[in-house]
Amino acid sequence: MKTPGAADGASPARPGNVLCAGPARRERRRTMERLQQFTQLLCGSFDNAAQFRQMQAKGEASFPFARHVNTPCNEKIRGLPQGFDGVFVVEESYYTVNGRTHASPHLFLFTQQGENIKLTSYDLPQGCGKAGFTFETMGEVAFGDLSPSKKFTPAVYTCRGGVWEGGSTSMFTPALKFTLFERFSSEGLEVSETMEMNGKRTFGYDVPILYRRTEDTAQA
């Protein structure tokens, strides 16, 4: 029996996009590998113990001992769109100065943007306050209930010689400016964050915080 619509001697019609499925699949795999490499550098437990000791020796008493814990959390988000390629990450930052510790948690989404990686900040899930929010305390949440931050300008990271770097500037209010610049590599994380009110710095340091991966999360 002839395939409907096929002329004598012609091959049966093939489903659309078969010819381009191979290249498209390879491109998607390459994209995912690039994003995976980025998140492998970013995720885990880090601190700036070595830098902190150096700053203390210089008499910089106000420079913090900082810990950074980054954990992928897609497993806790229900209803991700089919073919979703992004990686949600819970970022837990802890800053200790003169014996007092301040916690600063965030929920980020990392996606591929061409050859670059884009960071989009999300509001914490409804009912979750910044006090005590961690990957461990985060419950399951529906993707549709998550909202991108309206204040934070997405950051874009570019890879140069194995080092990812990028950041953004956000105007939280007409007078309050937040500036972020980061570098990620196998050596660790370099993070510079400043907050300015009417041009006067109210948060941040003269040098970036230099995080190194702690032994319990050393990369294989």
Describe the function of each predicted region.
Residues T31-S45:
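N-terminal helix-cap/turn-to-beta initiation motif at the start of protein domains
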Residues P4, L19, A24-T31:
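Short, Lys/Arg-enriched N-terminal segments with co-localized hydrophobic residues
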Residues E27-L35, L189-E190, M197:
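Short, charged low-complexity linear motifs
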